Amino acid sequence: MDLIRVNEAHCRDCYKCLRSCPVKAIRMERAPFSQQLRARVDESRCVLDGRCIAECPQKAKSVRPAYPSVRSLIAVNDDVWVSLAPSFVAAFAHLRPGQVLAGLRKLGFAGIRETAVAAEWVAAAHRKIAEKSQGPVMTSSCPAIVNLIEMYIPEMLPNLAPIVSPMIAHARMLKKEAPCRKVVFIGPCLAKYDEITRPGLTQDVDQVISFVELETWWAEEGIDPSQLEDEYFDGPAPLEAVLFPLDGGLIKTAGLTPDMLSNRTLTVSGLDNCQDFLINLAASEPVPMLVEMMACPGGCINGPLMPADSDDAFARRMRILKYREERPNYRENCPCPAMENSLADDARAEHADYEFLQRTYENRQIISVEPTEEQIKEVLAMTSKYAPEDELNCGACGYNSCKEKAIAVLQGMADPEMCIPYMRTKAESMSNLVFFGTPNGVLVVGSDERILDMNSSAERIFGTSRNHLVGTLASQWIIDSSDLRRVFEDNEEIVRLEKELPELGLIVLVTVVSAKKENVALVIVEDITSQRQRETELQLVRGVTLERAQEVIDKQMAVAQKIAGLLGETTAETKVILTKLMRVMKEEGNTDGAVSGDWRRPTE
């Protein structure tokens, strides 16, 4: 159905929904990219008690809204009626019952009646069946209990009264008056959304919305019921049946005693209690005649879809009881006819027509493949559980035992890393690996500037034991008090501050960071003494190398100068000789010209 939706951004894998789910219908899956665990309701296993919605601390779970469909239904149909659960009195602490009815009329409903009208017929039918039965009869008004029995304890189906819930009975009554009428049930129950889809019940109620949805709808329409005048129901006003949303309400309405000391009747509320009772019923003596079971502790007044501002369970119960006390006054002022609470009397019950209350059930037992012991051991080993004493069975993951969680892992419902003690140990071991395995010294300094802890590398750097340093002031060893105050008071960070520790013959780099949540500072000390020594040695080598290089350069310059001098002398001598030679050659040329005569033409 995709009825329960999960906002993955808000789901913080706290496992509270899983811890609160009696049938463990929560599937833990990893998100595609972040790989973080996220909870998803497996509706094929869910009995729809809705506790996971109410218990989620991040409000990450919600119900698929149905009121838009109801609004559309009203828009095209002028005969849409409300069947209003009697728990409405407890749902809206700031409203009078008549104001709730006025608010509903503002939404466009053609008529409003109390579901409790049909509850009296349902209660009488249960009494009649119980009195004729040889074994205990389980009430069937709570759809979550019906789901529990059909899916997990089907052997109890013969004991489940074949009677529809007051919601279905009331819808059938309303549609008997007008076959084309549409019926919308409004209440605090999640399982009602599913009940109207069960075989044999699909033609009765057209839509279900919760009190939470009703508030949202009012807000969208700009309706403030607290500003409206009281209105009345359109139909009979039941009396005892207004107690139906309380544990023991059905038995009381049936004219039986809900006394806890009676062995004829028994009231069990809370899905855990109901589950335990049904499983252990065979060993019970004596067996009660009629067992009223309600999935919500204390009854429907504590349903998962009650408004958040509807007070505590005790206040809700008291409002229902007060409403019952004031019922005679309501009847006097109400224009609708009064409904006598005589349906449970033997005379009326004997002749009442219960055919329209009949229903059947189906065996929907959840069948899971049970893994072998070897497979279970392999999963347990993933979280370092190799022997029974390693299994803490703490329940932090949501399962009752480590073995139960291992089975869930094999069935695809859980993840090995859901084991909180294992993950804590793993995280601590990784932290210890970083803390104790790093070559740098790490000091944990408190706000009083005293050393709280240190790792073995710090012992090596400071040349003393942990016991000698813990409790002493950090300023005695490594960091000035003024620097620490900057870290604690101004939340500053000191990064790679170089300090000399002459008494230890060390040169270190100091980094100080604040762990504000723990109110401590981490002083990280990196020993760079050997590095600085290497740098000094390298500097010396560089100096010597530069000197040698300069000597070579000087020698090369001297040689070059000598060579240049010699070349200069040789060049000068060569120049003199060549000059003389050129002069001689010139003189010889002039002599040869005079002997041969003048070759130029004579002038005229």
Where are the model-predicted features located?
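Iron-sulfur cluster-binding cysteine motifs and their immediate structural context
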Residues: 3-5, 12, 16-42, 47-67, ...
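Iron-sulfur-associated redox domains of electron-transfer enzymes in respiratory
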Residues: 63-361, 365-367, 371-380, 400-408
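Sensory modules in modular signal-transduction proteins
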Residues: 426-459
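PAS/PAS-like sensory domain cap-loop motif
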Residues: 458-469
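PAS-family sensory/regulatory domains
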Residues: 467-483
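PAS-family sensory/regulatory modules and their coupling/dimerization elements
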Residues: 480-530
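Signal-transducing coiled-coil/dimerization helices and immediately adjacent hinge/linker segments
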Residues: 540-604
